[in-house]
Structures are given as C-alpha cells and as structure tokens.
A protein has these predicted regions:
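Extreme N-terminal leader/targeting segments of oxidoreductases
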Residues: 1-9, 27-28, 473, 523-540
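N-terminal glycine-rich phosphate/pyrophosphate-binding loop and immediately adjacent elements
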Residues: 3-143
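Rossmann-like flavin
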Residues: 98-207
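A glycine-rich dinucleotide-binding beta-alpha-beta segment and adjacent secondary-structure elements
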Residues: 187-201, 371-379, 434-500
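Helical element adjacent to the flavin cofactor pocket in flavoenzyme catalytic cores
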Residues: 214-265, 269
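Mid-domain catalytic core of redox enzymes
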Residues: 226, 256-389
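Flavin-binding catalytic cores
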Residues: 330-331, 365-372, 413-453
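A conserved FAD-binding loop/helix module that cradles the flavin
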Residues: 497-518
Length: 540
C-alpha cells in the first residue's frame, strides 16, 4: 500500500523560487511540503566537487548573483542568520581584447566611463547620461515591478504616462535591446560589451518590447557577487531556513503526477508512489510544459490552454556549453601587465571583438549551427573565495552560448563535445596563455543537452526557463491572460522562472506567487507585498 502524507500545501521543485514561496506560506501558519527530485535542493544553485581532484569545486549553473542582500525575500526571511556570505569583487566585469585593452564595469560609474572613453568619448558621455537619467527609473519602477505581479500593459501605460520617470520608462519600451544599443553607441566593441552583458542576463537582442532593459541594466549596474562556499551554499541556506521554520522538504523523490479531481489540484503522487494530499494548494516551480503536459496531463486541460502550455517557447540563445577547469594556478590574462586592476575582476569576457560577432552567434544558435567563433564569459571563483580550491590552486570556468538543437538533433552534442571543448579552450588560451597542459589538472564540460539531462526544468538547456520577449514577458509570462501565478486548475499555481519576472536568481517569481496564494487563501500577511497599481498612482 502506498504511503500517504497530508499537508496544507505542496511546492514542486526546491529551486530558490520554490523554497522562497514555501517559506512565506509556511511562516503564515500553513503546513508545507517541498518536493525535490534531485539529490539536493537548490535547482540552478547546484555545485559539484571535481570528479578527479577533491577540493576543487565547480559552480554548475548560477554563479553571478546581483544585489541579493537587498532583495525583499532575503530580508523578510532573515537569511543572514543562517551564515550566508557574499563577496563583491570590483571590477565586476572585464571584457578583454586581443590588443591588450579592455572594457570594465566598476562599482564606481566614473571608472566604468573611463574605460569606455578609451574607445569612444561619445559613447562614454552617452553611457554616463543614460546611467544618470535611468537611476530613478530603476529605483522607482523597474525594481518595484520585479517584486509585484505584473499589470496589464494598457493599465500600466496610463499610470506611467502621468509621471516623468514613467514616461522615461515608456520611451524605450517598444524597442528591442539591439535597437537601443545601435542607436546609442557607435564603437563596435562598446556595442559588443553592452550587448553581451544583456545577452548573459537572458535578453534576446531582437526581443520585442524589451529595449528598456538595456538602459535599466546600465543604471542598475552589472556588479555580480559571489557566494562563499559555491552557489550551492545559498541553496543550503534556504533549506536551513525552511527547517528552522518547521517547513518540510523531501530530496531525491520527484513528482510523478499532480492529482486533479473535478478541476481542482488535490495533491501529488511522488516517484516512489507516495501520495501527498494538499488541502489548500499545489505550487509548481517547474516550467509550464513539465507542469501541464507531463504532471497535470492534457486530459485535465481544455484544448485552448493545452495548446498554450505545449507552445511555451524556450530560448534558443541562452543554452551554454560550460568548460570547468581545476588548475595549478589561476588564468593570467594578457591585459594584466598593462592594466593590473583587471586581475580582481569577477567576470571575464574573452573572444568577442565586435558586435557583428555577437549577432552572428544569435543566428548560429537559432539555426542550430556550431558558433562560427567561440567567445565566452566566465570567472576564477577561487581567486575571490579560497574555499573553492585547495591552497595555492585554482578553479576557473567559461560559458559559451551554443544551440541546443545542434544540426537539428541535440544528440549531436555527444559526438562533438570533445572537438568543441578543444576549440573553446584554444580561444581562452589566446587571452590567458598560461592555460597550458601542465597547468590544467582536470577538465569537465557540460553541453546544452547535458544541462537538460541534469535539470529537466531547463528544457532545451534554457536556464532562463522560457524565452524572454514581449509576448512572453511581464503580463504575458508565461501566457497572455495567465500572468498572476494562477492556472485554470483551481488550487494549482506557478511559482517558478517561467513566470514574471523570469529567470536568474531574483526570487521574484516565488515571492510574488506567495503573495497571490496567501491572498487567495485569506491569510493574514506578515510581510508587505507591493500593490504596484496603487504604487504607480502615488508615483504620479
């Protein structure tokens, strides 16, 4: 006979959004169970020890975290009590060029502007002006909107037009990131620098109605932070917080199906046959295809919504080919001799010399071709956090954007993995010549197909969990008419990155979903979620 458990709510998937959602509802008095199919919680926060050399740690997915300590859920849930620590390297990013020059993103905007001025004084002036003009836009609109359920655009536009800061936001809303970049910056290397940083956040260069994201990125800053003890330490931190608050979680036991009866979600069946009844709700932290097509089943959906779910688009331009190295010594870049300040950078970009190369990569990814030329971003985590490698040694990695559906079949990655790894490493060596065979102790790589195999939430290797374009962003995420974290199945909610505000380690989907679920259940909210409509009314 199957084991039977009873809870008020079940959260499917112990990625950071799932755990955040569970925490808010558990602290509201509900008895919650979080179910995770992998051996450990964390989702995209996964980190592994090198399989050949113990003591070398590799951050498998997420590593560049931004402003986490100031986010509402971090503060509300008191995560500082559970031992988390972040390093804040400066510069946050260095883009190396073969002529030994570089572009850098520093905490001090004037230092960033100074590096841009070496390539184009006009671009430097433009960058500083965008940064100045968009400071209030980010603080008063973009950031608050991240942590609130999205408004319908017609309603939002009416409210935004009443304030100067709102009108500035709207000015570039109907453009694409590429249009903004090419209209405002003239130097091809500056264009490549800004464009690539946007792409590495999951932006589509030609994504409709997302042009505003580039000035927002400039004003917000690209100053990534590193979690001490690898990114998985944040997952551990969240798990400790759950336990501290009496919230249960299960690892290494995924959900086989969601129980639906008379149009209502009533619980889940786990892979081992355990039945978990959910008195109030089920919240899914996994993507819509996995949630609705596999776990709910199309027989429990009307035909129109079933088509919406099956048609959810995954990005063709966010999958990566990851190269991880265990080293005797850190990579030493060709720019260091003339510019020693680059040594302390967190993110390093190599191989990308012009904006045209970035555009070519988009075409290659979308047509399923190997990139014409490798160019990558990565880091040397052990330089900033000594716990990630043995004393005197180093870890480093590089990520190359690459197509999932290579030559029409993702299985082709199993055939060309070794060849592409060599090309990627060869390009890296042009910029860090000390990456010799003698220096490299161990190598590891992961193709876009490997990423999907490891985490089935990342369909097609898409760590953004859904293409981020105008018709699949904000009030259209995951689908038009279904942006409020609810679903057609009563009692079933979405709380993952397929919802607003999308991928990356923001916690926004989990935070926002918790507010919606709590409201539907009539709970007394112990936190203060933002009413974005009321907020914009007051802003005007």
């Amino acid at each position: 006979m199957s084991k039977v458990l009873k809870y008020d709510g079940v959260v499917i998937g112990a990625g950071h959004n799932g755990m955040i959602c569970a925490a808010y509802l558990g602290k509201s008095g509900k008895r919650i169970l979080v179910v995770e199919k992998n051996m450990e919680v964390g989702g995209g926060l996964d980190s592994h020890e090198d399989r050949n050399y113990p003591g070398f740690w590799h951050n498998i997915h997420s590593v560049f975290h931004r402003g986490l300590l100031m986010l509402p859920w971090y503060q509300d849930l008191g995560l500082e009590k559970f031992g988390i620590h972040y390093y804040k390297p400066d510069p946050g990013v260095v883009h190396h060029f073969l002529d030994k020059t570089y572009l850098g993103w520093f905490a001090d905007v004037d230092r960033t502007v100074s590096t841009i001025s070496r390539f184009s004084k006009k671009d430097a002036v433009t960058f500083k002006e965008i940064w100045r003009r968009w400071q209030p836009v980010v603080k008063q609109i973009v950031f608050p909107e991240t942590y609130a359920p999205p408004l319908v655009m017609e309603q939002k536009r009416t409210l935004l037009e009443k304030s100067s800061v709102g009108r500035e936001y709207l000015k570039f809303f109907n453009t694409t990131p590429e249009q903004f970049i090419l209209e405002h910056f003239e130097d091809p290397r500056v264009q490549a620098f800004i464009g690539f940083l946007g792409v590495m956040r999951g932006y589509e260069l030609d994504g409709s109605n997302t042009g505003y994201l580039i000035p927002a990125m400039i004003a917000w800053g690209v100053n990534p932070q590193l979690c001490r003890g690898t990114s998985h330490a944040l997952g551990d931190n969240l798990a400790h917080m759950l336990s501290h608050n009496g919230i249960d979680y299960i690892e290494a036991n995924g959900v086989e199906r969601i129980l639906v009866h008379d149009g209502r979600a009533q619980g889940v069946v786990l892979d081992d046959g355990t039945v978990v009844h959910a008195r109030n709700f089920v919240a899914s932290n996994v993507n819509p295809v996995e949630t609705f097509i596999r776990l709910v089943g199309r027989e429990n959906l009307d035909s129109q919504f079933g088509e919406l779910a099956a048609g959810f688009r995954f990005s063709k331009t966010t999958p990566i080919f990851a190269t991880n190295l265990a080293l005797n010594e850190r990579p030493k870049y060709i720019t260091e001799e003339q510019h020693p300040e680059v040594i302390g950078s967190f993110m390093h970009i190599v191989g990308l010399e012009t904006y045209t190369e970035l555009r070519n990569l988009f075409e290659d990814c979308r047509t399923g071709q190997l990139p014409r030329k490798p160019f990558m971003n990565g880091a040397t985590p052990s330089y900033h956090d000594a716990t990630q490698a043995p004393p005197g040694k180093a870890t480093a990695f590089m990520w190359q954007l690459a197509p999932y559906n290579l030559w029409g079949n993702p299985q082709n990655w199993d055939k060309v993995r070794g060849e592409w790894f060599k090309r990627q490493l060869a390009m890296w060596r042009h910029y860090a010549p000390n990456l010799t065979e003698e220096n490299i102790l161990s190598t590891d790589s992961a193709t876009p197909l490997d990423i999907e195999r490891h985490d089935r939430n990342m369909y097609c290797g898409d760590w953004m969990i859904g293409e981020y374009t105008g018709d699949q962003a904000l009030e259209n995420r995951p689908f038009p008419g279904w942006s409020q974290y609810r679903t057609p199945i009563e009692g079933l909610y979405l709380c993952g990155s397929s919802c607003h505000p999308g991928g990356n380690i923001t916690g926004g989907p989990g935070y926002n979903a918790a507010g919606i679920i709590a409201g539907d259940l009539g709970l007394d909210l112990w936190w203060k979620p933002l009413d974005f409509r009321e907020y914009l009314l007051n802003l005007s």
